Amino acid sequence: YNKVATVNTLEGSTWTDVTPQNVPSKAGDGVLRDPLSPVFDPDDPNTYYIGSWLSGLYKISNDEVVANYFTNNSPLQIYNNWSCIVPSVQFDRDGNLWIAEAAGGTIDKPLMILPRSKQQNVDISASDWITMSVPGMNFNFKMHLMISPSTNYKLMTDGTWSSVLVVL
């Protein structure tokens, strides 16, 4: 963990570095670190979300960080006194943003949904999110959430050899 990340685009045969600058992060150095599970906003091709190992969830639009969802504006919590891990980020077919927080069983409701109607708000708070628990699921950094665009089924696994498969 704590690895510096870059974001690049490919046009034809040319790669261009479009890594966001001045990124709010736990390290405090303005650098994007430890990206997990990037996903494009289905309503805006210039916007994407990236989970992170230390600093929650980033919303990036036109190559700039426009939001960092952390403990101050989401239900995310600090785990083990040092990290806020978001290993899985997805959109459902209605445009709702789903995230899972890896918390080693320390959070009651580690599955979180930011409804489409709230995503454009400037001041998003924890109360804007819907939270839920999933009995039997170990929300760890290997967990994965997939959402079918045609059926809207949600599949989750914790990524371990003894994993359960949950269908919502």
Language-model segments: which ranges?
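Carboxylate-rich, polar loop motifs that coordinate divalent cations or form catalytic acidic clusters
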Residues: 1-168
